[in-house]
Regions:
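Active-site-adjacent beta->alpha loops and helix N-cap segments on the catalytic face
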Residues: 94-96, 115-130
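Conserved, mostly hydrophobic/aromatic
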Residues: 27-28, 85, 106
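Short glycine-rich, polar/acidic loop-and-turn segments at beta strand-coil junctions
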Residues: 39, 87-89, 117-119
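Short, surface-exposed connector motifs at secondary-structure boundaries
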Residues: 105-111, 129-131
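Alpha-helical segments flanking ligand/cofactor-binding loops in enzyme cores
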Residues: 100-104, 124
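Active-site mouth loops of central-metabolism enzymes
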Residues: 84-96
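Hydrophobic faces of well-ordered beta-strands that scaffold small-molecule active sites
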Residues: 83-86, 111-115
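An N-cap/entry alpha-helix motif that binds or orients negatively charged groups
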Residues: 2-79
Length: 131
C-alpha cells in the first residue's frame, strides 16, 4: 500500500451526527447513499438508531477508580479495550486504500477489525498491512 497524506477531522466534528455530516460532504451522493443505508426496508437500521436513543449514562463522581481498566482478552489476545471495527463492504468506494486504511487506523487505536466477506481487499493483503 502506498502512503498518502493523512487527513484530520475538522474542529467541531465530535458526535455521530457531526461525523455523518462531514462524511456526506466528502463522498459522492451514490456512495453516501450506500454507506448510510440499510438492507431491504431498513427495519434493523431504524431499530438500532432507536436503541441507541434509549441509552443514558449515569455519571458517578467522587468514586475510587484506581486499578480500573478497559482491557479484555479476546481470541487469546489482550486488547486495550473491547472495541472492534464492524465489517463494512466495499470500502474502496470511500477510500483508495480501502480495508487496509481502516486496518491501520484500527491498529493505531488498539482496536480490532472484522473484515467483511464483501471486502474490496483480500484478507491476506489486509493482514500484511498490520502484521
Amino acid at each position: 500500500m502506498s502512503s498518502t497524506t493523512a487527513q484530520t477531522l475538522p474542529d467541531g466534528v465530535v458526535t455521530l451526527a457531526d461525523h455523518e455530516f462531514h462524511a456526506r460532504s466528502l463522498l459522492d451522493e451514490a456512495v453516501w447513499a450506500y454507506f448510510n443505508g440499510g438492507a431491504a426496508d431498513e427495519l434493523t437500521l431504524r431499530a438500532n438508531a432507536q436503541a441507541w436513543q434509549t441509552i443514558e449514562l449515569l455519571p458517578r463522581v467522587m468514586r475510587q477508580l484506581s486499578g480500573g481498566h478497559t482491557r479484555v482478552n479476546l481470541l487469546g489476545r489482550e486488547w486495550p479495550h473491547p472495541i472492534l471495527v464492524a465489517p463494512m463492504a466495499y470500502q474502496r468506494l470511500a477510500h483508495p486504500h480501502a480495508e487496509q486504511a481502516t486496518a491501520l487506523a484500527a491498529a493505531a487505536l488498539g482496536a480490532g477489525l472484522v473484515l467483511s466477506t464483501q471486502a474490496s481487499t483480500l484478507l491476506e493483503d489486509v493482514a500484511r498491512t498490520v502484521l
